[in-house]
Amino acid sequence: IAVDSRKDTDALAKVAEHATRPLTIDLQENYRLAEVVAPWVAKLRYNPGHLYHHERDRPIRDKVAYLAETAATNDCAIRIGVNCGSVDPDKLEQFPADDSISPMLASALEHCELLDDLGFERYCVSLKDSDPNKVIEANQRFAAQRPDVPLHLGVTEAGMPPDGIIKT
């Protein structure tokens, strides 16, 4: 469930009251909503590329520490959700413009290291692109470096049927 505003959190509370299965939320661009929604869900998803949108002067490590502490306090897991369309700007600058996979990989690995350093172990990673071949390559490269981290597989912006169904 995507959550990006207080209105969304109010709706989530109503959905959670009737849910018969654990819920996962996608914090979209507002990571500060984590503490509001965490009591209702089993997993928090954040996008490392979106952590730059709020409190730009606050270090990324502090933002990840807030998410890890919130998740731990509420018995939630975390998904580090790296998306080809919103990669951390600093990572994009480190690689050639025609290499879209390496910045995603660098971002995912950095955030795994941040959570590891914080002692938070209940996390998985997703590396998504609209091109299924890039998704496969990104996940294979990630798994070669971090075989200990579970992967959440999928494409982003899959599209409408039939192409969207085939990609997914």
What function would you assign to each model-found segment?
Residues 1, 21-27, 44-46, 76-82, ...:
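Hydrophobic faces of well-ordered beta-strands that scaffold small-molecule active sites
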